Amino acid sequence: MELAPDDVLNVGTGIPNDVVGPIITEEGMSEDVTITVESGIYGGIPMGGIDFGIAKNQFALVRHDDQFDYYNGPGVDVTYMGAGEVDAQGNVNATCLGPKPTGAGGFIDITTNAKHVVFCSSFTAKGLDCSFEGGRLHINQEGSLIKFVNRIKQVSYNGKIAREKGQKMHYVTERAVFELQAEGLTLTEIAPGIDIQTQVLDLMEFTPRISPDLKEMDMAIFMEGAPFGLREYIFSN
């Protein structure tokens, strides 16, 4: 839902590329926003998985280094990136997951300069299994790995610096949405069917601020069938 008409988007590897890109196409918004990928792609449908970096039906392809000139411009309105760990200050680790560092790729350049950063992640990891029915989310098996932690292993994205720059930041999971505000990481939305205490707060190593205007995610997100009205929502807000 974090979109506006005519936005230029960047999608990173993982959930952003594999989910956000196809949803934009599925919802009929391909002509309303421009999707870019760090390899130099403009438009089209980004390919997922091991095919990250290529797309179908793109309208332009530029050199990799020229793409980063644009990103550092800054040219991106909204970037969608993955997140391995998040702390109470909104810092993100996306570069040191497990025993070996994975490297940053274009993550730092893009998240530093985009006007709005949306981190996309599952709430827990390692074994998480979810389903949805009738507009409600069901956690069939909880992940054993906590992702919202007191201390992240490596700072790939600095929430304090980003906030000082006036960047807009959201952290979106299947069951909860957070925003980095002046008071710290703030819970702003929760999925229908989710218990805030046992399925959110108890699975975090820190206690986030809870927005006094806490909302429920649109139940249409958790309904079978497509489209669910994203284009109409964007143009009416």
Which residues does each predicted region cover?
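Glycine-rich phosphate/diphosphate-binding loops and the adjacent beta-loop-alpha structural elements
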Residues: 2-10, 184, 222, 227-230
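N-terminal active-site beta-alpha-beta segment that forms phosphate/nucleotide-binding
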Residues: 1-59
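Basic/polar N-terminal segments that are highly enriched at the extreme N-terminus
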Residues: 229-237
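Conserved phosphate- and dinucleotide-binding cores of soluble alpha/beta proteins
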Residues: 45-227
